Curated annotation (Swiss-Prot):
Keywords, in A-Z order: Chloroplast, Membrane, Photosynthesis, Photosystem II, Plastid, Thylakoid, Transmembrane, Transmembrane helix
Entry membrane topology: Single-pass membrane protein
NCBIfam families according to UniProt: PRK13686.1 (NF010239)
Protein name per UniProt: Photosystem II reaction center protein Psb30
Gene: psb30
TM segment ranges: 5-25
Length: 33
């Protein structure tokens, strides 16, 4: 495991994890309005 591969994996995982979170936050904001 090279550092570049680890960095790419963490970057992809953060995008995959943060995607639904951002959508949920937008849905909550729209619901509050």
């Amino acid at each position: 495991m090279t550092w570049e591969l680890i960095a790419q994996l963490t970057f992809l995982t953060s995008i995959i994890v943060s995607g639904p979170l951002v959508i949920a936050l937008l849905a909550i904001r729209k619901g509050n309005l």
